[in-house]
Amino acid sequence: MSKAVGIDGGTTYSCVAHFANDRVEIIANDQGNRTTPSFVAFTDTERLSGDAAKNQAAMNPANTVFDAKRLIGRKFDDPEVQGDIKHFPFKVVDKSGKPQIQVEFKGETKVFTPEEISSMVLTKMKETAESFLGTTVKDAVITVPAYFNDSQRQATKDAGLIAGLNVMRIINEPTAAAIAYGLDKKSQGEQNVLIFDLGGGTFDVSLLSIEDGIFEVKATAGDTHLGGEDFDNRLVNHFINEFKRKNKKDICGNQRALRRLRTACERAKTTLSSSAQTSLEIDSLYEGIDFYTSITRARFEELCQDLFRSTLDPVEKVLKDAKLDKSQVNEIVLVGGSTRIPKVQKLVSDFFNGKEPNKSINPDEAVAYGAAVQAAILTGDTSSKTQDLLLLDVAPLSLGIETAGGVMTKLIPRNTTIPTKKSEIFSTYSDNQPGVLIQVYEGERARTKDNNLLGKFELSGIPPAPRGVPQIEVTFDIDANGILNVSAVEKGTGKSEKITITNDKGRLSQEEIERMVSEAEKYKEEDEKEAKRIAAKNGLESYAYSLKQTTSEKQFEEKVEASKREAFTKACDDTIAWLDENQTATAEEYDDKRKELEQAGNEVLKDLYAEGGVPGGAPGGFPGAGGAPSTEETQGPTVEEVD
């Protein structure tokens, strides 16, 4: 059985799955949830991720990081990044043109790249899988929005490396969802399936034809910056204005109030998918003022109507690109939590002349499900279900080079099936030109200045010749991850240069990745040390209380003389008082303190045992002692329930 997993690293929530014994298992985290918030938080003492990080967001807004996926692989001056920064409670700084996240961690100012934050979320998913599978997990297939560009894909791959994963493949989210939908549907002839994937932060539409286990993507389109969070933002702004109207106060400057309001808005949005109205009740939201209000589904739909409508543009685009009429679409599959919104479902259904979307797959889990199937295939774990499965994905954006006059000359048009390789011959622009600059762009516009520069390289040493004579063959090669290699050869001399488009400016260098990997390991060790410290503290605390309880038992008073009794009770009380004052002591200090208490206890408890055992005590042990081992012995649980 292979231990490869599929990870859907979402903008707001992530999910991990594993394929074994002919079925996919979605793996629940330590809280029992099948999806985990893509949150990382930094405090004075520790680093938190997942549910633990999200749950303390209101108390620690400046150091709780989320939405790394909206920053990954982008430039700092990207208008969308600038728009997001206005909403973020944490600080985003410009480091050589890239956005980085600045937080306070253990009393120091730290700066992290979006890749590092994403890697922490991926590490959390990796650990979730490891505790379920009972073994280390190295191999993973990670999904990205279909409309992610080259640098966003590379950055996602880097995040996986930093998390200590071997990223076997980067696959597109809608394609993964299509596998989840089509895995059990074998013999229905060719089906055109439209995947409508509206998640927490990104939106994709892909049109596939599925036939006999072959999943061929015909076209893809989307918006890497549209999702449930944008709907939350509309609600948050609506309620900020309402609060202003009612109380003449603006809560915009108070991050804690904004976080509490946002959490309430997320909840309200979810409720409005199943009821027509919901109320928000937030006690003491701002300056002691309670905020009680309500919102109807109709009002919510009106607040977001332009966003909802804009989801249909990519649908029209994929139909046009795939040269299909809407009547030729056999199934519409909804993926992503935001497709639970009734208005979104209705818009899609109306667009397809009343055709009902297919709801046979879980919108939150479908992407991880498909990624797990792909991971199993790549590790050679063939079962009857997967052996005939073939994925043919496409490049989402056209790729080309700049030619004279700033013209974009496309070598690979968008929606070309990948992996693919394409060569074209170019020449020099002026007489005796000694070299050419090859600039690689992605995008759909006619002029390169309107497209995205991926990278450039120089091919020099061309022998002097009139313009148009030298033959320079440029080859574009896209691998299965959608990542591009470009090479150029001067035919006369055989001189060649090549570049893996790793986004010169944007991509992390090998050294940086190695540094981040070792830092990630260091943080992990610190996290484990902190967990050990907490266990020692809790162990000492419950031990001290259980001994103290013994002192109040009747037998104790009867069998132990008063002076010993008082000394022992004082030792227990002193330990408890010491614990209150030393919340941040080391594991060793807690263990030493425990040994002192054990010695004091041994003296007194000998008298008790001599008289023939103690009720409630384990044979040969102190009452309650089995339940709170020190960190050196690991028998028994180290957790106690607090009412």
Swiss-Prot record:
Native source species: Pichia angusta (Yeast)
Residues with PTM N-acetylserine: S2
Protein's recorded name: Heat shock protein 70 2
PANTHER family registered for this protein in UniProt: HEAT SHOCK PROTEIN 70KDA
Matching Pfam families: HSP70 (PF00012)
UniProt keywords, alphabetically: Acetylation, ATP-binding, Chaperone, Cytoplasm, Nucleotide-binding, Stress response
Region span, Disordered: 609-643
Protein localization: Cytoplasm
